[in-house]
């Protein structure tokens, strides 16, 4: 791992995804926008599967939502390493989610524990 390293994923959420989330979470959601927890799940996916990857422990996530994400529109979530603390096995990352036109939907940061920080 190194500072500046990043990964991205792009996906859209459908009305069916929204219905399943609403049923699972027993949540009231607007019918035409992606719920914020689903956007947060994109960051969780990237951190746990790609960077740092398997064995990562999620310690903290801060998200600031700047705009709503419409259904059926591609969203690109990105996590980028901003700081490495190998002595504590900690990795700080910037997180962003954008629409295809570049509109910033969400920005924030994450802190994870990763045993192979110094590798």
Q: Model segments located where?
A:
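HotDog/MaoC-like acyl-thioester-processing domains
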Residues: 2-5, 71-119
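Mid-chain, well-packed structural core segment of small domains
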Residues: 52-84
